[in-house]
């Protein structure tokens, strides 16, 4: 993503919350990501998350549908979960940067982030 941005002379920013700014708050809520992953593994009869990932996304014949398949996968994986305290903190930080960038550009911006964060950021 950085190389492509450089080629088209796009401005780039790292928008994740720096480690030094993260609170040490511990969230003891169940790990929704692990629960969702276990459900997907059972539903697809796959042995582990690597096998599932290869089956869903590494087959070159599926490359044209990859963006929508990834969006669907992470939306299902995340569900309605707000995430743990650290992810909520990180996503709030990212959302502020995204809002700032949209104001600077009078519109759309491209965000490259982990798939777990994409559904939450799209709602903010």
Where are these regions (language model features)?
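Compositional signal for N-terminal targeting/processing segments
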Residues: 1-124
């Amino acid at each position: 993503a950085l190389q492509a941005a450089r080629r088209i002379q796009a401005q780039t920013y790292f928008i994740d919350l720096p480690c030094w700014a993260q609170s040490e708050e511990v969230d003891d809520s169940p790990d929704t990501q692990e629960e969702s992953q276990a459900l997907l593994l059972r539903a697809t009869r796959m042995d582990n998350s690597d096998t599932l990932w290869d089956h869903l996304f590494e087959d070159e014949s599926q490359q044209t549908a990859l963006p929508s398949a990834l969006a669907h996968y992470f939306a299902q994986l995340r569900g309605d979960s707000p995430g743990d305290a650290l992810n909520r903190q990180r996503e709030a930080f990212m959302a502020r940067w995204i809002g700032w960038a949209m104001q600077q550009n009078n519109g759309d911006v491209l965000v490259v982030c982990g798939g777990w964060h994409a559904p939450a950021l799209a709602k903010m």
